[in-house]
Amino acid sequence: AKRTCVDPSKGRQQAKLYADLLEQKYGRRPVIFLTNGFDTRMDDGAYPERKVAAFYSKRDLEKLFNLRSMRISLKYVQVDKQIAGRYYQEGAIKAVCQAFGEKNRRKALLVMATGSGKTRTVIALVKVLLEHGWIKNVLFLADRNSLVTQAKRSFVNLLPDLSVTNLCEEKDNYSARCVFSTYQTMMNCIDTVEDEDGKLFTVGHFDLIICDEAHRSIYNKYRDIFTYFD
């Protein structure tokens, strides 16, 4: 932590020395946060240092370390063909897994035509990432209630063991592993939904965010969602 008039990167070397010593002592490298009160940056050791909206909560950090210990390589994944059996669906899923695993990326874009099975592709991808220990909590965003309802129904049918909730309809069910919402509803929930520890939808709450449509107008209007969640 530095004063507001100081660039938080000034403390980077000092923080890394602390992290090195803690790793030597406890056998696990801690997450580094750099801040001056306005800008906050995070170095989790898995990805390049990046800007975040706030500190991770204790629960976020525990989940991060638990997932890291359970994570399996995505190099040789088996796609559930009962969910996504078309060759291009399997190819899309493997391409995303390669981007996340081998190329160490944090974002992926799938461009698929109407009727090509986008939702099934995403469901099969979620199953792969869950089975390989890469994710725990999922957020599915769409710009209309009907699309949210339709997507949730598909997830329930194809992944019946995954707990799900639709924030547009279920106002008191926030503990599900897979959350479905419109952009506007999620904007409201970020600030208003709390549990006994405070804000529920913290910066690191979701491990995977799926956008039903990724066009520029959506991003420009709801940019805050994507800059808030890490």
Tell me what each language-model feature is.
Residues D197-D230:
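SF2 helicase catalytic motif II
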Residues M187-I190, I218:
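Activation segment
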Residues A1-N137, A142, S146-L162, Y174-C178, ...:
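ATP-dependent helicase/translocase motor core
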